[in-house]
């Protein structure tokens, strides 16, 4: 396998067993090696971000946030907006594309089960367009 991969698709590569079994070492390779994160899986990105927090590795956190920002800009939809919003809120991060998506789709979003699961502060944040969180 080429060590200078241009694209890393975590979902596909997980099934090809390219990882060593040591997720910490694999995660470090994303930052210090030649790999970039190209997965569009929100759950994989959250898992990697949590690992970066556990390792206190700011470079890995930055790489994951960069990819989550891309997902937020180009891939966000009705199936993943809630998970992405929760990720940004829980980590005290902001994203203008997420805010724009929510504002543009509020009529559809407010009638979803995910919206009904929000606490009062989150609902007020979304409905009032208060950019203190996202």
UniProtKB/Swiss-Prot annotation:
Sorted UniProt keywords: Early protein
Stored InterPro entries: Orthopox_C5
Protein name in UniProt: Protein OPG030
Domain BACK, first and last residues per copy: 88-133
Source species, domain of life: Viruses
Family the UniProt entry places it in: Belongs to the orthopoxvirus OPG030 family.
Induction: Expressed in the early phase of the viral replicative cycle.
Gene3D superfamilies attached to this UniProt entry: 1.25.40.420
């Amino acid at each position: 396998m080429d060590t200078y991969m241009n694209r890393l698709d975590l979902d596909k590569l997980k099934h090809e067993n390219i990882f060593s079994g040591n997720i910490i070492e694999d995660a470090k390779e994303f930052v210090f090696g030649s790999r970039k994160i190209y997965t569009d899986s929100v759950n994989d990105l959250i898992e990697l971000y949590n690992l970066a927090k556990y390792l206190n590795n700011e470079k890995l956190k930055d790489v994951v946030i960069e990819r989550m920002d891309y997902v937020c800009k180009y891939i966000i939809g009705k199936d993943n907006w809630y998970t992405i919003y929760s990720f940004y809120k829980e980590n005290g991060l902001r994203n203008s594309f997420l805010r724009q998506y929510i504002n543009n789709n509020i009529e559809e979003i407010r009638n979803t089960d995910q919206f009904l699961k929000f606490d009062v502060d989150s609902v007020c944040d979304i409905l009032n367009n208060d950019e203190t969180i996202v």
